[in-house]
Amino acid sequence: MHKLNRYFFVLVLIALVALPVRPQLSVKPNAFKRDPSSKALKWANEQLRKMSLEEKIGQLISVGVNATFLNQDSDDYRALKHQIEDNKVGGIILFRGQVYESVILVNRMQELAKYPLLISADLEAGAGMRFESTVNFPWNMAVAATGNPEYARRQGEITAREARALGVQQIFAPVVDVNNNAANPVINVRSYGEDPADVARFAVAFTEGAQAAGAIATAKHFPGHGDTAVDSHRGLPEINVGRDRLNSVEFVPFKASVDAGVGAVMVGHIAMPQIDATAVKPLPENLKSKPTDTDEAGEIIEEKAAMPATMSPVIGNILRKDLKFPGMIVTDALSMSGLTIYFTQEEAAVRALEAGADMLLKPADADASFRGVHEAVKSGRITEQRVEESARKILAAKYDLGLVDQRITPIDTIDRIVGSRDVPALATEIAEHAVTLVRDEDKLVPLKNLKPGSRVFNLAVTNGDDRAWIANAFVTRLARGGVKVETIVLDDRSTDQEVQKAIERAKTADLVIASLYGRVRSGQALSVGVPEPGARALSALITAKSPILGISFGNPYLLQGFPGLRTYLVAYGDMPSLQQAVARALLGEIDITGKLPISLPGLYPRGTGIQIKKTSHR
């Protein structure tokens, strides 16, 4: 009997030893510093001495994936596995996906990779921008509307903390573009505003918060995407200004970010003809990559254009030598039409390296990008030492991020870190301090003068495919405060009958709320605008002099298209925190203190904001 017990004990012990050791994420990752440690450089150099040319090239490429569930026999999984095992790519950029599916997929790729992968994501508005069921922070312009950079710092810290818990080490944020063009279709509320010094203050705060929490922050989109009227997902934007103007406006927040130690800078597909006038022409259709980032409206093709910044050694030298940036330079996605209209993926990859880039982000065809660089080295167009220079930066960053010791993200810590109470609390706090009352000629705000039983009609207009739920957070919170509203949502599919019904219902209401969801929608022709059916209905109600309370849950410049709105309130986004904050402001439950970080040309200057004290103590 004793022998049997001893035998059983030995079997159990063997089984326990055989179990894989699950690495635990440290309570707080070490702060990331741009200058690599001596240990990181030593390790990077040791790897480079052992690497083949192909492995060195692979380190420079970061491929994109929507982090959803992928069966191991699926085409998408096989394609990703091919990049990891055959091209030895150095990183992955994550797009929309579920939390656990994302981490499991990344962990599997980390296991397959010979060298640790650097995982990145666009987390400008927090983890919720890419991971389902996590919290979205308000857009940068809302953060700036509070006037308090400490919110940006706290947002950066929380974003990095959640990113690391989700297996992401590099954040493609903050956006440091100065949005001084009201017609900008892609930056808009993603910017901290139009004042270079203010943008710099908030960008530096976010950067310091994020890197203190152990992630690489990435200032984007150099040399500046704010004064453009073309979305680089659809075409090549141009900023036709000279160096003096760039030094005093566009470069200010980039220089401040560099001085603050930002780890990376993303260069955008932006033409600067007064800086680099080298002409580029569209490729023949048979050589172009298929557009991946545009809607049915298609690409915007300029027959005569100047060299994109991502391909320009002149602009690369400004960043390296004039702004003295020694860190990692990342291209904007090489799949974007602002680049693919003019360059093949092979040529784009080589030119990006010639322009000073270190990371080749999301090629439309990673095999082609790899092949292009490989052939350029073999032909002598670029040297292997040039490839090593960028690979060294990326490898050293991986070491200092702790990926050499621990590349696998523990699953069991995610629900203790991601979405903790301080995350929605901060989103709510920012939102409630951001709400901006620009105009209130009829004294409609707050709704204290609304009589019991009054009919309130909400005309919601959206530029998204979300009519079934887009206004829910707003109207639900109003109802909790005792204001019930009838809502009709109009979008670009709305019929004439639906428009007429909305107009008729509005005309019988005691108060009309016009909720305008004209949001940034990258690659979409209607980005930051409102669809024609909704615009037609709102214009008819303004003409009929209906009592209208206009709210922008997105683009703050919409008042320019509807100057007849006598009351206009700006929330800068459609996040639940912002919709609920507006509802609370209308109910008189919170102070209204936000101020415009931008001017509304011809209407209101930057800094406008009517201050109203709360009237309710709920």
Tell where the protein language model's regions lie, with residue ranges:
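Bacterial N-terminal signal peptides that target proteins for export
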Residues: 1-9
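Bacterial N-terminal signal peptides
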Residues: 10-18
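Preference for extracellular/luminal or secreted protein segments
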Residues: 23-82, 311-312, 321, 342-618
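Second-shell residues forming the walls of enzyme active-site clefts
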Residues: 49-52, 76, 92, 101-117, ...
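Short glycine-enriched loops at secondary-structure junctions
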Residues: 66-69, 121-129, 169-179, 219-225, ...
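Catalytic domains of carbohydrate-active enzymes, especially glycoside hydrolases
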Residues: 78-95, 157-171
